[in-house]
Curated annotation (Swiss-Prot):
Signal peptide: none annotated. One of its GO terms (biological process) is adventitious root development. It comes from Oryza sativa subsp. japonica (Rice). Expressed in roots, leaf blades, leaf sheaths, shoot apex, flowers and panicles. InterPro entries: ARR-like, CheY-like_superfamily, Sig_transdc_resp-reg_receiver. Pfam families: Response_reg. The modification 4-aspartylphosphate is found at D68. This is Two-component response regulator ORR1. The keyword NADP does not apply. Residues 9-135 form the Response regulatory domain. Induction: By cytokinin in roots and shoots. Belongs to the ARR family. Type-A subfamily.
Amino acid sequence: MEGGRGVTRVLLVDDSPVDRRVVQLLLSSSACAGSFHVIAVDSAKKAMEFLGLKEEGKEQAIDMVLTDYCMPEMTGYELLKAIKALSPLKPIPVIVMSSENEPQRISRCMNAGAEDFIVKPLQSKDVQRLRNCSPANTQCCDAGSDGKPPLLLLPSDHVVVDATAASPPPPPSRRRAHFAGVAMVLHSSSVELSHYFPFLFKFILLVYAILCLGELLHRWSNGCFLNLWCA
């Protein structure tokens, strides 16, 4: 069930601090207009502990899970299956993220019940896909009622293809995806650090003045205050 006034509570699961920061910055940006409240954990086991705190009969603590695919100890795929088994009558929407666009991996997750599969890093164009998978939205990314295999949105270009007939596209560079996430974090950090530049400049001037004063006192004590070339 969604939070008050249309706020979707998202449980973010990712072992990468950079990728967690990218998602948090994006979903808390002005473009999202307060549509999401993000709770972040760094492992699938911690996510299971969080979900296990729910008492039977109570409302769900979160509205959807956004998880990385590759994580140590317990993968995002294993977390997906555990969540679907945890609440079969009222399943929690699960969106899987990965830096590799592999059709077999996408098909595996979708067949296990994932609502969507997004290639990292998460971008502004992916926000609507998260909204589509909200419990309040009946047009989520499910299989059609005709029993045909689900049509998957490959996140690299958002072209709809059939998972059973698509030829494997060249996987995107993991390094490129990682660098894009790092660049986004560095950009936000540079904005925050810019406020400290005046203070840093004044501090450097103060240190320089202290060093100059120390040199003058040293020359004075040696009796050569006016001799600039005194050794």
